[in-house]
Amino acid sequence: MRTTSPYSHCSHVEMNAGAFVTMLLVALSVCVAAAVDPDVIQPFPQPKPTTIAQKAAVKYKPLLYTSMVVCVPYAAVDAAGRVTDGLKGRHGNDGCTYARHGSQVYGRVEPYGNLSAIMYAWYFPKRFWLGFPIQRHDWKSVVVWIDNLESKVSAIVAVSMAKSDTKYNTETELDANDFARLQVDNQIVISNTSLRFEFFEFGLRSSYLRLTGYNGQYQNLIMWDQLTDAAREALNDDNNFGSAVVPLSDKQFKAHVKEAYPSKSVR
């Protein structure tokens, strides 16, 4: 009669457990390796626009000015799908006043109601509250509302600016001071397509975006449909940016556009 060692089953379990632990450690190491220092991430170059939506997004691309107490925008993801690990929420804006490889602005377009929404979103490696950094990762966005995306004489009818992860302030009365000043043939020309925004931190609230009289800077624009599959997958992963909400992800985009939709006065 064949006998079975009382330890044979245990040995089999231990072997499986060891293999499982090894696989888990490998998986964790891969996940950790996927998040890298902000200065390692290479932003996407701005491609030549080919579609109506892409051309409109370039036409209306805004300037962003950052105050001296917050971070400048960084690239959040590279072509391989690696994401930034952000920076710890401490020591003011140390380590995030200059993006070594250049900054990035992300765009996505959606028709909504009788208007077209162009969302521009920026990533920041620290989140600020009451003037102090409190945690890793922050996203801020604006939605520029266009009356007719396909028309050569299309115009901005409103702009909605993020005041939190999901809420927007909407402005329908824009004046010349809200638009960029561009130098053309030794003359300063006021744009009628490029708005000026400031990433601002003041008072008893989180940092937010507002219209400003400062010119700021342009960033390379990459549209959602121009990203690599790996980059889109990374931006769609809620685990990659802590509690910060990626406003143009597949999960969030439509809800943000709906929230930002302006009042009846401009519909």
Swiss-Prot record:
Its main location: secreted. Glycans are attached at N114, N192. It comes from Plasmopara viticola. Belongs to the Necrosis inducing protein (NPP1) family. A motif (Conserved undecapeptide motif) lies at residues 117-127. GO terms for cellular component: extracellular region. The keyword Signal applies. Disulfide bonds: none annotated. Probable secreted effector that may act as a pathogen-associated molecular pattern (PAMP) recognized by the plant immune system. It comes from the Eukaryota. The lineage of its organism: Eukaryota, Sar, Stramenopiles, Oomycota, Peronosporales. Residues 1-35 form the signal peptide. Keywords: Glycoprotein, Secreted, Signal, Virulence. The gene is NLP6. It is found in: Secreted. The structure of NLP effectors is remarkably conserved with a high level of conservation of a central region containing the conserved undecapeptide motif AIMYAWYFPKD and heptapeptide motif GHRHDWE. This is NLP effector protein 6. A motif (Conserved heptapeptide motif) lies at residues 134-140. InterPro entries: NPP1.
